[in-house]
UniProtKB/Swiss-Prot annotation:
GO MF term set: molecular sequestering activity; protein-containing complex binding
Biological process annotations from GO: spliceosomal snRNP assembly; spliceosomal tri-snRNP complex assembly
Residues with the Phosphothreonine modification: 124
Protein name, UniProt field: U5 small nuclear ribonucleoprotein TSSC4
Amino acid sequence: MAETEAGLEADEPTEDDTLPSDTVSLSDSDSDLSLPSGVEVQVLSPERLSEEGQEDSGPEDPPSPPTGTLTTAVQPFHLRGMSSTFSQRSHSIFDCLESAARQAPCSAPQTSVSDNGSFRRPVTPPSQTPARGLSRVHGNTGPTRVLPVPDYVSHPERWTKYSLEDVSEASEQSNRDAALAFLSSRSQVSHTDYVPSFNQDPSSCGEGRVVFTKPVRDSEARAERKRVLKKGVGSGAGGEAAVELAHLAGPEAEEWSGHQGQPEVVVPSEAAHPESSSGPIGVKAVGFHGSKKRSRDHFRNRDGNPGGPGSERGPSV
């Protein structure tokens, strides 16, 4: 039994083991600030502190003065079960914070909580309000800006004044009458020089339509002249006249038809070609020539004259 009791006494932790040593320093880098078992954190009111102080003090010590003014002060932070050195350090830290808070100027009015739980703002002193108002008034004062004088006031000769006093006020009825009179005068204007465009003629006969025609070329005009000449020759011979080709090597063969070289119809007279008079009466030779120039040596005379221009070389194939 004695051995068992001795073992139990050795296993029980003592108060010195639970308290941290004074040499251990506190730092901001400590992440785990867990307190050992048995340590209680309490917030002591000033009344409780005074009661504890009276209990700790002896009967011979004089009583402490009443602390009625400390009721509104901030309740100090106190840890029970810690060493005296740690308690002094904590008190010194919080005292420094409180002194720094007192020295800092109040930039904004702080709200306080009344007894019924509603927030109330402190009333600003009335002495500061007129001073700020006067400072703003004095700060805004400056040289007044003079507005420029208008030009029509300083130089009235440059401006012309118009007045509508002599003009009668127009009504809606007068405007309507003026518009109708203008439209009636426009409708009475004759449209003699008006030519309706395509598909704008109101009549059913289609007068004034635009007819599109193909432009006439020079070759078509010459062909038309050929037909007119044929009709004239036929009517002079009694309707049975024949058209013969004149000799291509004649003097009329070298005549060219303008600058474009189109073929032309040439009707030689009997005085120029006496040999053509041997034919039937009313027969006229018609010569055709192209735009390409040909040599006379390659052509043979119609009547087979050996003294012709092509008799020396013989007939051309």
